[in-house]
Amino acid sequence: MDYKDYQYSRDAAWRILIDCHTTELPVRALAICQALGIPVRRTSLIDAPEGRSVALNGRPVILLAEWPSPERRRFTLAHELGHIILGHVGRVGLLNREPSPEDDPLEQAANVFASRLLAPACVLWGCNVQSAAEIAQLCGISQTAAQFRWERLQLLYQRGKFLVSPLERQVYAQFRPYIEAHKR
């Protein structure tokens, strides 16, 4: 994924946090879908994919399996929301949720969207998060997803690259009361 595509996905996640007036972790992905008018339908079929975003009668719908852990469902829901927000619905049939260098670019973009929506770096930085375990606990995501986010956050810590974008500063300001209450 090139930086321009990464930026687009990241910024889309920040815009959703801002537009939906999200102010605390864990981010309530289902409430965001409801606020955006995107129905989420659950399936209990054990052999069903974890999630899929589709268009029914010209409107986006997210299909979400009930069998994964709540943390995994949260990430899958945010991932599928990313496909919708980024305009992928109808363009992709892949169902991969575990990030991989071989991922389709649309899957990579949806993963970036989901991780930035559920675990915004500026909020984690503001809370002085120092481990994947802390990310998993604060954000309500799986240890695997938290580890990927922690690895990226460590790079940002090394570079000192926080609050550079006006959108990121807006997200930080919106979460400020939460950050102050959860600073470690």
What are these regions (language model features)?
Residues 1-184:
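Active-site hotspot residues in diverse enzymes, especially metal/ion-binding acidic/histidine motifs
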